[in-house]
């Protein structure tokens, strides 16, 4: 039987409280159906409450932010639906900020990975205000998602969140991410990738130019997942709050087929769980995103993908094998 974690959380004032935001937003990419309802219906929040004994603070809604969508949203700098994504992520940023400011651990269930513009900006601001320090981001994904608008071939904003969050991409228009302020941003030095295997040429150049720490599947094959996680955490340092943003497509499609941009040669489910377990064991986790679960794609694999997503979240929040 699962029991609550005994790991003391260093940066969470209300360690028993879990702020949950469910986000059914998919306009950062072309596929509809990126929605956390399957995770919730599979009992994820019940498991976190009953087995891990979290006091769940959730409004019971899956937010689509449809009320914030403008009537007209033409492309801007090559970005598709920029005003829609900006408005949705600004609202999400406020929601995450409210939870994090209260000292709660925050779990956001997506939603495509563009929502990280909202989640990370909200957490970063709250951590600066509450603790007076910068946080780190561990981004577990097959993709780097750090394209600047002008570098993106697709124009889909789910491939750009880290460009905006690090300040490598900016826009002065309030309706198109101009609302992002310095206290919403993270330093490229505090960003670590794990699991990369489909990185655009312009993104590779940015990673090198800015000295961003990135561990690809080549590194995992070479060193093993244990050593890679050790190196990632050593880069961040022991006294740094961590926001974990986990794209389910980091897993090999064998384990998570129901996602919009699957790439073969990825993490096993155990490797994904190990990353999440190890971050929990640091006692430094302040927020987690799980994104890009889309049960409408590869419907025969939907239940497998949902089970994998639930496992990743439980592992990050203190579930153990023994």
From Swiss-Prot:
Its cofactor is Mn(2+). It catalyses: L-arginine + H2O = urea + L-ornithine. Keywords: Arginine metabolism, Hydrolase, Manganese, Metal-binding. Mn(2+) 1 binds at residues 113, 141, 145, 247. PROSITE patterns: ARGINASE_1, ARGINASE_2. One of its GO terms (biological process) is arginine catabolic process to ornithine. It comes from the Eukaryota. Pathway: Nitrogen metabolism; urea cycle; L-ornithine and urea from L-arginine: step 1/1. Mn(2+) 2 binds at residues 141, 143, 247, 249. GO terms for cellular component: cytosol; nucleus. Homotrimer. PANTHER family: ARGINASE. This is Arginase. It comes from Coccidioides immitis (strain RS) (Valley fever fungus). The gene is ARG.
């Amino acid at each position: 039987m699962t029991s609550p974690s005994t790991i003391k959380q260093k940066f969470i004032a209300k360690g028993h409280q879990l702020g949950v935001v469910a986000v059914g937003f998919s306009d950062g990419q072309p596929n509809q159906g990126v929605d956390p309802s399957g995770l919730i219906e599979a009992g994820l929040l019940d498991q976190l409450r009953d087995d891990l004994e979290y006091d769940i603070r959730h409004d019971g809604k899956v937010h689509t932010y449809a009320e914030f969508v403008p009537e007209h949203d033409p492309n801007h700098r090559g970005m598709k639906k920029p005003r829609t994504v900006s408005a949705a992520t600004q609202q999400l940023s406020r929601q995450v900020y409210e939870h994090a400011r209260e000292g709660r651990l925050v779990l956001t269930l997506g939603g495509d990975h563009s929502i990280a513009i909202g989640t990370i900006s909200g957490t970063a601001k709250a951590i600066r205000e509450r603790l007076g320090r910068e946080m780190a981001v561990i981004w577990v994904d097959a993709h780097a998602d750090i394209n600047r608008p002008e570098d993106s071939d697709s124009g889909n904003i789910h491939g750009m969140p880290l460009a905006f969050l690090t300040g490598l991409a900016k826009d002065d228009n309030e309706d198109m991410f101009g609302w992002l302020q310095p206290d919403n941003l993270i330093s490229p030095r505090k960003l670590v990738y794990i699991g990369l295997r489909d990185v655009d040429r312009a993104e590779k150049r940015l990673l090198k130019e800015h000295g961003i720490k990135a561990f690809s599947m080549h590194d995992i094959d070479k060193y093993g997942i244990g050593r890679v996680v050790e190196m990632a955490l050593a880069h961040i340092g022991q006294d740094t709050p961590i926001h974990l943003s986990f794209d389910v497509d980091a897993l090999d499609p064998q384990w998570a087929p129901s996602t919009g941009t699957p790439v073969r040669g990825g993490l096993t489910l155990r490797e994904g769980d190990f990353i999440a377990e190890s971050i929990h064991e640091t006692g430094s986790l302040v927020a987690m995103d799980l994104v890009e679960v889309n049960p409408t794609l590869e419907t025969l694999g939907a239940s497998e993908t949902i089970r994998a997503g639930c496992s990743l979240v439980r592992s990050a929040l203190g579930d153990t094998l023994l």
